Swiss-Prot record:
One Pfam match: RNase_T
Any one of the GO CC terms: cytoplasm
Keyword Hydrolase belongs to the record: yes
UniProt keyword Plastid, yes or no: no
Record's subcellular location: Cytoplasm
Name of the protein: Oligoribonuclease
GO molecular function: 3'-5'-RNA exonuclease activity; nucleic acid binding
Family the UniProt entry places it in: Belongs to the oligoribonuclease family.
Top enzyme class: hydrolase
Gene: orn
Role description: 3'-to-5' exoribonuclease specific for small oligoribonucleotides.
Record key words, sorted: Cytoplasm, Exonuclease, Hydrolase, Nuclease
SUPFAM superfamilies tied to this protein: Ribonuclease H-like
Signal peptide location: none
């Protein structure tokens, strides 16, 4: 098990909406890669219990998406609190990356970070202050080399583990076709 400060922590949350002042986390997943984006380990994929009242207040997009992908049923069946999910995730990460070493990695990761700061502050503090946001490269490619955007298509299941896997593949795609490091 390679515990290494160069390893990268990838995270994705699914939430009941976009406003951390009103909405909550309903799923969390993590993956650890090496610096070359090779997956070393997948962390626990955790549905976080939330009240029916909160779930019923989700907007139409969230209701439809999280019903179709089965997440609402998993959330209702879950007994996990946000704190329990946070602790399980931290237990996993501590085996792979020292505290403060990895930037938080993912797509539109600042949104996830806002929820972590509010509801999982110990996990938020585990990351380096920097972000590795794949959506930054997507935005730059759209402006500087839009033709390469056609080469990568997402499944968009809006399940946390699937979203992380896609983010890693997307960054590898941009590394090969946009950044050309060779």
């Amino acid at each position: 098990m390679p515990f290494d400060k160069q390893n990268l922590i990838w995270i994705d949350l699914e939430m009941t909406g976009l406003d951390p002042e009103k909405e909550r986390i309903i799923e969390i997943a993590t993956i650890v890669t090496d610096k070359n984006l090779n997956i070393l380990a997948e962390g626990p994929v955790l549905a976080v219990h939330q009240s029916d009242e909160l779930l019923n207040k989700m907007n139409d997009w969230c209701q439809k998406t999280h019903s179709e992908n089965g997440l609402i049923e998993r959330v209702k069946a879950s007994k996990l609190t946000e704190r329990a999910a946070e602790l399980q995730t931290l237990d996993f990460l501590k085996k792979w990356v020292p505290k403060g070493a990895s930037p938080i990695c993912g797509n539109s990761i600042a949104q996830d970070k806002r929820f972590l700061v509010k509801y999982m502050p110990d996990l938020a503090d585990y990351f380096h202050y920097r972000h590795l946001d794949v959506s930054t490269l997507k935005e730059l490619a759209a402006r500087w080399k839009p033709e390469i955007l056609e080469g990568f298509k997402k499944e968009n299941t809006h399940l946390a583990l699937d979203d992380i896997r896609e983010s890693i593949k997307e960054l590898a795609y941009y590394r090969e076709h946009f950044m050309k490091l060779d």
